[in-house]
């Protein structure tokens, strides 16, 4: 087992209990809300601490995904690459998320169709950002990156650049700002 397989294995099993709990909690909330309980239908209010627990689970999962992604800093860019010997942008995102049980579509264009659209001002660590590719005249998603930090409104993301896996800053970037298309938030509870 190489270093990256061991990390993936350890992350997957350390998160299993949290994922199982989150799925169970989401199912219970959904079942009660939809009136599957034996009593007559009544207004149902989700306790605030339960919603906080869900927020904490999402935050923990996105933090774990980001920390796992950082293990690959410096891995070279390889067009079509989907392994620690070399990644392209969507191959990197797929590999990282697969370590947490996500089975995502392969292309950046396909990934851009998943999740919930969020504004730049609403970005959180764990969100995905989508950009035009190298050819600015093509108005289509051609690149994807994972947001790692948004402290003080400064957006940093990890991605497979031509120079390899690295972290870049979005704000005031003469390369990424004009190529930005949209951002998406993944459903971390649903997986």
What are these regions, as identified by a protein language model?
Residues 2, 35-57, 141-191:
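Aromatic- and glycine-rich peptidoglycan recognition patches
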Residues 2-6, 12-22, 29-75, 186-191:
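Intrinsically disordered, low-complexity
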Residues 20, 138-140:
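A short catalytic or substrate-binding loop motif that flags glycine-/basic-rich loops and adjacent residues
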Residues 56, 75-125, 136:
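Catalytic cysteine-centered active-site loop
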Residues 134-136, 150:
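Short polar/acidic secondary-structure junctions
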């Amino acid at each position: 087992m190489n270093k990256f397989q061991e990390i993936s294995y350890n992350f997957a099993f350390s998160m299993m209990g949290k994922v199982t709990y989150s799925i169970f909690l989401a199912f219970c909330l959904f079942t009660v809300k939809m009136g599957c309980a034996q009593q007559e239908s009544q207004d149902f209010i989700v306790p605030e601490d339960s919603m906080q627990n869900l927020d904490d689970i999402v935050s923990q999962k996105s933090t774990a995904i980001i920390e796992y992604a950082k293990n690959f800093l410096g891995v070279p860019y390889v067009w079509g690459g989907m392994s620690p010997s070399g990644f392209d942008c969507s191959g990197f995102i797929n590999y990282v998320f697969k370590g947490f049980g996500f089975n995502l579509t392969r292309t950046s264009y396909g990934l851009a169709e998943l999740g919930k659209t969020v504004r730049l001002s609403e970005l959180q660590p764990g969100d995905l950002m989508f950009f035009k590719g190298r050819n600015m005249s093509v108005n289509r998603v051609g690149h994807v990156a994972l947001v790692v930090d948004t402290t003080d409104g400064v957006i940093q993301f990890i991605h497979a650049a031509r120079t390899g896996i690295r972290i870049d800053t979005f704000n005031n970037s003469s390369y990424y700002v004009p190529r930005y298309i949209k951002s998406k938030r993944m459903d971390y509870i649903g997986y």
